[in-house]
Amino acid sequence: QLAGVTRATPDPPGGHIVRDEHGEPTGLLQENAMELVERVIPAPTLDDMVEALRRCNDAYVAAGITSSQDAGSDHPLQVEAYQRAVERGVLKLRTSMMIRHQLLPHLLGLGIKQGFGDDRLRIGPVKLFADGSLIGRTAAVSRPFLNDPRPDNYGITIWTQEELDELVWQAHAAGFQVATHAIGD
């Protein structure tokens, strides 16, 4: 409701608003439809993010984990939070950050390329999402999901092939590898 999602709100490209039998939104937003709500959620502060990294780091280290990979940083503040965590000595894990394509222009503007960093924190490939997940029944599949309320549910493709090709070329032209989330068949 706070995001203004109503029965008249169309599904965004690459997303789906789950609706009840009367066409009313149920509150479940799949894939890119989540962005409708993310826009109205207050952003965490830099200190909140550093504290969250500290807590996660402590739990991982206590479990004997020494390395991690953030598979989808999409905001400049996330990069800064990781850097502050390193500066404050709270990031003990060796961490590689996959960056979402939205963050690529920002990093390039700073002269940052894949591999930038040190043994504690490094910028990795660009992360793209081609489809959703199996558990959410949003992976792009060649046959509809069985026992789904929507008998024609073939999942969600986030991008057209042309859009995906363009994003891959942009990343490669900038010197980045691409890691693509592609769960469906």
Task: Locate the predicted segments by residue.
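Acidic/histidine-enriched ion/cofactor-binding microenvironments in catalytic or ligand-binding pockets
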Residues: 115-122
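Divalent metal-binding segments
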Residues: 1-110, 124, 128-184
